[in-house]
Swiss-Prot record:
Superkingdom of origin: Bacteria
Name of the gene: cas4-cas1
Cofactor note: Binds 1 [4Fe-4S] cluster per subunit.
Region spans: CRISPR-associated endonuclease Cas1: 224-559
Binding residues annotated for Mn(2+) 1, in chain numbering: 87, 100
UniProt KW keywords: 4Fe-4S, Antiviral defense, DNA-binding, Endonuclease, Exonuclease, Hydrolase, Iron, Iron-sulfur, Magnesium, Manganese, Metal-binding, Nuclease
Summary of subunit composition and partner proteins: Homodimer, forms a heterotetramer with a Cas2 homodimer.
Gene Ontology BP, a term: CRISPR-cas system
Name this protein carries in UniProt: CRISPR-associated exonuclease Cas4/endonuclease Cas1 fusion
Length: 559
């Protein structure tokens, strides 16, 4: 590669390894700032602790009889355009060899090791040469098998290494992510498979057969909800401790916490907030009644490229209308399915009226043909009116009165009856979930396509949650009422509004979390996935659509 012109930073040598292994993986990690641990990467971090603790320095002047044994040596070269932290440099005088540690066992292949590892080691040797040392070879040390494999820096390997540097630099400058590997055995073991979505992207681009079920299990912990106004949350080692009036009432391990949600006047100490930011655990702030007020994250996702695509496409009226149509069609379809599945009645009224289902089907057709966002908004409103007019028929007792619940129409700000109070709270929680999911993949939750940007309103979160309102929020309300978890005595009425009591809110949150953890079969990809993981997958698919990698955004519609 020619000498860098300042348009891209120096390429980390470890990224050359990823590029030779999979160009898309290197692009995701280096250009877009994506990363996710799995058992293999965590094990690698543990096994690297000794060499990473070095901070070694090479002698500025070499002597013939001087021995060199330095760990964790950092070197860079503007001419080569690369930088590296070498695990170990050993040698004597001007003749040195880099040693790179690998977590696994030695592979019995030609050359003693796979090409990505040999290229990475050779790049380290080239850096040593740039700094005045002679380096004709190095070694790979495989920790699991405790074997050392020598690697000679011959002309062929040097040529391949220089070509890899040039290829990666050009790829980074292109601004186009390389396509996913095709049906590769590398994908299932990759820690970024749930971010890359190789099979899903190829399937949606009509390039391959149905995706393999390679979505990793949820391993990011669970949300921590703190709703007591007297709660005081502090850090104690690797835990968040919740106290009330200096009495320890609960604790949560930071490593098992995916996000923190604070209601009302609950207090989070500065030290605890700093630790959440360091670990990239988002903190959301809600009013006492559950209204979403704000979101605290660390420095934010480094994927500027994704947000650039988002902002560019959000100013395109055709893109906005196309996405909005599909969101509303999916929402109406899921509302229709919820009515059909949960309708309660006897005799001739045991099933949802065909006329109602047909009207909702017509609403879907009209929404797909809406000529403008304003017309689409009217169609959505009319369809929502039909849906909520019959919402009580899904409540136990037919009209909801058997459980003491009466619902006739949707109202809010403030909700005036128990069912509306539950719906508003569920929608606020779903908004928070989508805000967290969108920020986690590099999108701006506040720049929408259907919902217009307004101060403090997470417009894109509101866009994306439309198809999930009936599937997650409304379903949680139905289950809470029909299963007897929430009763009419669990509400406080004041100032013309209706709100949940503290104990009832805690039970409802538990029900919402159960729904988020429930697994469902994806109608397009055919694998099972939890609703929580599904939100992230859908958010990542939106980024793939906005970048032009897939032709259309695939909404989630149940049958």
């Amino acid at each position: 590669m020619a000498e860098t012109d300042g348009s891209i930073p120096l390429i980390p040598v470890r990224m050359l390894n990823e590029h030779v292994y999979c160009p898309r993986l290197a692009y995701l990690m280096w250009v877009q700032g994506e990363f996710s641990h799995n058992e293999f990467t965590v094990d690698g971090v543990i096994r690297h602790r000794r060499v990473d603790a070095g901070g070694g320095v090479l002698p500025s002047e070499t002597q013939e009889d001087s021995r060199i044994h330095a760990r964790s040596v950092s070197l860079s070269s503007e001419r080569l355009g690369i930088t590296a932290k070498i695990d170990l440099v050993e040698g004597e005088g001007a003749y040195v060899s880099p040693v790179d540690y690998k977590r696994g066992k030695r592979p019995h292949v030609a050359g003693g090791a796979y090409e990505p590892e040999r290229v990475q080691l050779c790049a380290q040797g080239l850096l040593l040469r740039e700094h005045g040392f002679a380096s004709d070879g190095g070694a790979l040390y495989f920790v699991a098998s405790r074997e050392r494999v020598p690697v000679a820096f011959d002309d062929e390997l040097i040529g391949r290494t220089l070509a890899a540097i040039d290829e990666m630099g050009r790829t980074a400058l292109s601004g186009t992510m390389p396509p996913p590997l095709e049906d590769s055995p590398k994908c299932p073991r990759c820690s970024l498979v749930g971010i890359c979505l190789p099979d899903e992207v190829r399937f949606l681009s009509h390039l391959s057969v149905e995706p393999r079920p390679i979505i990793p299990a949820d391993g990011r912990g669970l949300p921590l909800y703190v709703q007591s106004p007297k709660a005081y949350v502090r850090k104690d080692g690797d835990c968040l401790v919740i106290e009330e009036e200096r009495v320890r009432v609960a604790e949560a391990r930071l490593g098992e916490t995916s996000q923190v949600a604070l209601f009302g006047n609950a207090t989070l100490t500065t030290a605890a907030l700093h630790e959440c930011l360091r670990r990239e655990i988002p903190v959301t702030w809600l009013s006492y009644g559950g209204w979403f007020m704000g979101h605290t994250v660390s420095t934010g996702h480094r994927n500027v490229e994704t947000r650039t695509y988002q902002y560019q496409r959000s100013f395109d009226p055709e893109t906005c209308l196309n996405l909005a149509r599909r969101w509303i069609v999916a929402k109406i379809a899921n509302c229709r399915t919820l009515l059909r599945r949960n309708w309660r009645g006897e005799g001739d009224e045991a099933k949802a009226p065909p006329g109602l289902l047909m009207s909702l089907q017509d609403d879907m057709r009209h929404a797909m043909r809406a000529p403008s966002l304003e017309v689409l908004l009217g169609i959505e409103g009319a369809s929502a009116g039909r849906y909520f007019q019959h919402f009580s028929r899904m409540l136990r007792g037919g009209d909801g009165e058997g459980m003491g619940f009466d619902f006739t129409t949707r109202n809010r700000r403030p909700p005036k009856d128990p069912v509306n109070a539950l719906l508003s709270f569920a929608y606020a929680m779903l908004t928070r979930e989508w805000t967290v999911a969108l920020a986690a993949v590099g999108l701006d939750p506040y720049r929408g396509f259907y919902h217009q940007p307004r101060f403090g309103r997470p417009a894109l979160a509101l866009d994306m949650m439309e198809p999930f309102r009936p599937l997650i929020a409304d379903s949680t309300v139905l289950m809470a009422i029909n299963n007897g978890e929430i009763r009419t005595g669990d509400f406080v009425r004041s100032a013309g509004g209706c709100n949940l009591t503290d104990s009832a809110r805690k039970r409802f949150i538990a029900g919402f979390e159960r729904r988020m953890e429930q697994e469902v079969t994806h109608p397009i990809f055919k694998y099972t996935i939890s609703y929580r993981r599904l939100l992230e997958v859908q958010a990542r698919l939106l980024t793939r659509y906005l970048s032009g990698e897939i032709p259309a955004y695939p909404n989630f519609v149940t049958r």
